[in-house]
Amino acid sequence: MAFVSIAPLASRCCVHKSFVSSREVKPLCRTIPTLGRCRRGKTVTPSISMCWTATVLDDGVQRRIANHHSNLWDDSFIQSLSTPYGETSYLERADKLIGEVKEIINSISVEDGELITPLNDLIQRLSIVDIIERLGIDRHFKNEIKSALDYVYSYWNEKGIGCGRECVITHLNSTALGLRTLRLHGYPVSSDVLEQFKDQNGQFACSAIQTEGEIKSVLNLFRASLIAFPGEKVMEEAEIFSTIYLKEALLTIPVCSLSREIAYVLEHGWHTNLPRLEARNYIDVFGQDPIYGTPNIKMTQKLLEIAKLEFNIFHSLQQKELKHLSRWWKDSVFSQLAFPRHRHVEYYTLASCIDIDPQHSSFRLGFAKISHLGTVLDDIYDTFGTMDELELFTAAVKRWHPSATKWLPEYMKGVYMMLYETVNEMAREADKSQGRDTLNYARQAWEAYIDSYMKEAKWISSGFLPTFEEYLDNGKVSFGYRIGTLQPILTLGTPFPHHILQEIDFPSSLNDLACSILRLKGDILTYQAERSRGEKSSCISCYMKDNPGSTEEDAVAYINGMVNKSLKELNWEFLRPDSNAPITSKKHAFDILRAFYHLYKHRDGFSVARNEIRNLVKTTVIEPVPL
């Protein structure tokens, strides 16, 4: 998980002034042994702006605490949320419209001679699939989507496709959209089809005057280029060309559905795109221009109404799940701890942005709970705990029994029991889906996670700077991607035999690449803040140690190159046609990476969850779509 802390602390022994009263403040700020706790119902809220160094009087323990802001989503606010969209009438209306759209889609197989002809039947099928997927309603049309793509693929050749099956000339828009869509659905298609759209100089060409049709073609070229596999130079060239083209187009075209779509795609791409956020955006895009993207205005209007209804119906389920999660947090020890980040609502938002299936409540809630646990443990190991306490907690996790709490300090006892109970509860839920005991999988993942934190704590304590390779090997585990992925996906209701799980979980290439990408990307955005509080180890500093004379800029450039290369390798591991694990089995693991990567577009979105992430919560969880 995104457990990297970025709070700028001056020293290892820093405790917030909220823990002390004015009469107790002396040089070095001596205070009472609160251990970061307060009475039930009274949370000590750290300030955003300052952090004081303090010493606990009774035992002389020196602690530091990051200046993380408090929980932004009060339980009373969450419990007050209400919506009418869980009523049966909305469900019935959505089901009726879904049936009507299926009839329209199935009728496309019979050309009407006007809208659907042998000269445009391929692009029309692709466009309909694309619209359905971007509106977030594709789970209702799986058979129709497969039928449409099978039809398109039957006419695919080494040069791509034209707009229709009887077109003798291939078309950039049809070929680019086809390449992207077919590849994402597991069809073996080569990027070599794009070579024919270069000029005699080997460059992608465009006309002197930008037309709407050309802009749409280049937009789909950009979208296709993001689904690149290793070694596909033409995809790299396509991405560079289309990025420049689209940025220039935004400066010249008026504000409209097309400009809004371009801006969204350039901002979120594919690896940082979240399906529910995308659906919310395209509801507005198609609402602004009902004929945008398809000639069948009747079908587009129905699809738009389905998307709005589905968004709001799921919104009613989100409220129920969020209320459960907020009560879980409020009634736990977490709400009494002042030092850690409280991001349970933000984690739930991520889960509900990548999985909107009503049957997957266990996945969404489990992901939020497990991720929040990981964040609290990160703040304990990274800042608050002493080395002796961390050794005790590490041993307790390996013992995995409630009796292990008797050796722990008071504030750790509650955290340990929440970890123990939550992991066991999720294991019982996963056992129902998998038909076998899954607790050992979870325990192994948590032990590895805690061990990686213990190693980092020792590095900080001793001032040791590891090699780049040693740091990354440990950092891939300490990021927490594995613990955030393993148990939640085992609750989905899909059986994961051992050989399938091995291609998703550790030590699979998919898991290793995801962990590497997130650790490297996280460090690029947080190393300066970590260095300011005395933490030497980061991929930046370790690279510079291994390469004397290199600068921070050199290190960042090298690591960005590693990330970009790894993203292409991850695309291949996710979509490769020869994999034993089907794409559907790997999708949640891949989407969890996209959720975390979304937070690291510009900065650590969890340590400071006030801007983009707060807006994400509001637009995808709190606020319904106007019908």
From Swiss-Prot:
Motif placement: DDXXD motif: 378-382
Pfam families for the chain: Terpene_synth, Terpene_synth_C
Catalysed reactions, semicolon-separated: (2E)-geranyl diphosphate + H2O = (R)-linalool + diphosphate
GO biological processes: diterpenoid biosynthetic process; green leaf volatile biosynthetic process; monoterpenoid biosynthetic process
Main location: plastid
Protein keywords: Chloroplast, Lyase, Magnesium, Metal-binding, Plastid, Transit peptide
Residues engaged in binding Mg(2+) 3: E530
One Gene Ontology term of the molecular function aspect: magnesium ion binding
Enzyme class: lyase
Cell location: Plastid, Chloroplast
Cofactors demanded by this protein: Mg(2+); Mn(2+)
CC annotations in GO: chloroplast
Transit pept. (range): 1-21
Keyword check for Cell membrane: no
Enzyme Commission identifier(s): 4.2.3.26
Pathway terms, separated by semicolons: Terpene metabolism; oleoresin biosynthesis
Cofactor note: Binds 3 Mg(2+) or Mn(2+) ions per subunit.
Residue sites binding Mg(2+) 1 per the record: D378, D382
Function: Terpene synthase (TPS) involved in the biosynthesis of monoterpene natural products included in conifer oleoresin secretions and volatile emissions; these compounds contribute to biotic and abiotic stress defense against herbivores and pathogens. Catalyzes the conversion of (2E)-geranyl diphosphate (GPP) to (R)-linalool.
PANTHER family in UniProt: (E,E)-GERANYLLINALOOL SYNTHASE, ENT-COPALYL DIPHOSPHATE SYNTHASE, CHLOROPLASTIC
Domain notes for this protein: The Asp-Asp-Xaa-Xaa-Asp/Glu (DDXXD/E) motif is important for the catalytic activity, presumably through binding to Mg(2+).
Protein's UniProt name: (R)-linalool synthase, chloroplastic
Species for this entry: Picea glauca (White spruce)
